[in-house]
């Protein structure tokens, strides 16, 4: 059982954010605010969501993309963080798992995810 004051605070934090409905296997683009010295800028990070974890304001997603020289880069983002300005779903993936950690061992075309077809 959780404290009702904490639950009310978390609900107030969640209301302000516009988070789209997505799941593991979807390709997402996150607009992340980066602060360098006294300057701030927005950098897009696009990749496949390989895991969603947690609930409420503590919810996180793990996003994997392939960088230069075919090196996989994974970052964990708290969804309700102030540093995330926007989350956009680029394409829906057809997967049968909630956690796609097996993609770490695959390379090239084997690491592709089929697109989900709507009926």
UniProtKB/Swiss-Prot annotation:
SUPFAM superfamilies: Translation proteins SH3-like domain
Xref: PROSITE patterns: RIBOSOMAL_L19 (PS01015)
Keyword terms: Ribonucleoprotein, Ribosomal protein
A single GO BP: translation
GO cellular component: cytosolic large ribosomal subunit
UniProt GO molecular function: structural constituent of ribosome
Family: Belongs to the bacterial ribosomal protein bL19 family.
Primary role: This protein is located at the 30S-50S ribosomal subunit interface and may play a role in the structure and function of the aminoacyl-tRNA binding site.
Identification of the protein by name: Large ribosomal subunit protein bL19
Lineage, broadest ranks: Bacteria, Pseudomonadati, Campylobacterota, Epsilonproteobacteria, Campylobacterales
